């Protein structure tokens, strides 16, 4: 599902809301989540899951084309951990 699909589905299920309002709400939610992670904080949505940052230490990688060794810098990457309710819903398929 893409962001456009999400907006379309929400607009059709919440017909009392204008599509532009739904789009603005989705955009604002995603921006708020990105800003929260950017500031180093964790996001927890009970029953759904949590978003956090995981630290990746610097390491020596390899260029797949040339085989040349490349120094990779340390970085933080976003991580999603599904909640119990979401895991149970997905596993019941």
Swiss-Prot record:
<dbReference type="GO" id="GO:0006417">
    <property type="term" value="P:regulation of translation"/>
</dbReference>
<keyword id="KW-0804">Transcription</keyword>
<dbReference type="InterPro" id="IPR000119">
    <property type="entry name" value="Hist_DNA-bd"/>
</dbReference>
<keyword id="KW-0810">Translation regulation</keyword>
<comment type="similarity">
    <text>Belongs to the bacterial histone-like protein family.</text>
</comment>
<keyword id="KW-0805">Transcription regulation</keyword>
<dbReference type="InterPro" id="IPR020816">
    <property type="entry name" value="Histone-like_DNA-bd_CS"/>
</dbReference>
<keyword id="KW-0238">DNA-binding</keyword>
<dbReference type="InterPro" id="IPR010992">
    <property type="entry name" value="IHF-like_DNA-bd_dom_sf"/>
</dbReference>
<dbReference type="GO" id="GO:0005694">
    <property type="term" value="C:chromosome"/>
</dbReference>
<dbReference type="GO" id="GO:0003677">
    <property type="term" value="F:DNA binding"/>
</dbReference>
<dbReference type="Pfam" id="PF00216">
    <property type="entry name" value="Bac_DNA_binding"/>
</dbReference>
<dbReference type="GO" id="GO:0005829">
    <property type="term" value="C:cytosol"/>
</dbReference>
<dbReference type="GO" id="GO:0030527">
    <property type="term" value="F:structural constituent of chromatin"/>
</dbReference>
<dbReference type="GO" id="GO:0006355">
    <property type="term" value="P:regulation of DNA-templated transcription"/>
</dbReference>
<protein>
    <recommendedName>
        <fullName>Integration host factor subunit beta</fullName>
    </recommendedName>
</protein>
<dbReference type="InterPro" id="IPR005685">
    <property type="entry name" value="IHF_beta"/>
</dbReference>
<comment type="function">
    <text>This protein is one of the two subunits of integration host factor, a specific DNA-binding protein that functions in genetic recombination as well as in transcriptional and translational control.</text>
</comment>
<dbReference type="GO" id="GO:0006310">
    <property type="term" value="P:DNA recombination"/>
</dbReference>
<comment type="subunit">
    <text>Heterodimer of an alpha and a beta chain.</text>
</comment>
<keyword id="KW-0233">DNA recombination</keyword>
């Amino acid at each position: 599902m893409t962001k456009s699909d999400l907006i379309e589905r929400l607009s059709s299920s919440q017909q009392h809301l204008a599509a532009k309002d739904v789009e603005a709400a989705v955009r604002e939610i995603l921006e708020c989540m990105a800003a929260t992670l950017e500031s180093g904080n964790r996001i927890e949505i009970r029953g759904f899951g949590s978003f956090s940052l995981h630290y990746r230490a610097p390491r020596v990688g390899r260029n797949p084309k040339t085989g040349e060794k490349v120094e990779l810098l340390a970085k933080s990457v976003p991580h999603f951990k599904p909640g119990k309710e979401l895991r149970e819903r997905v596993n019941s398929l």
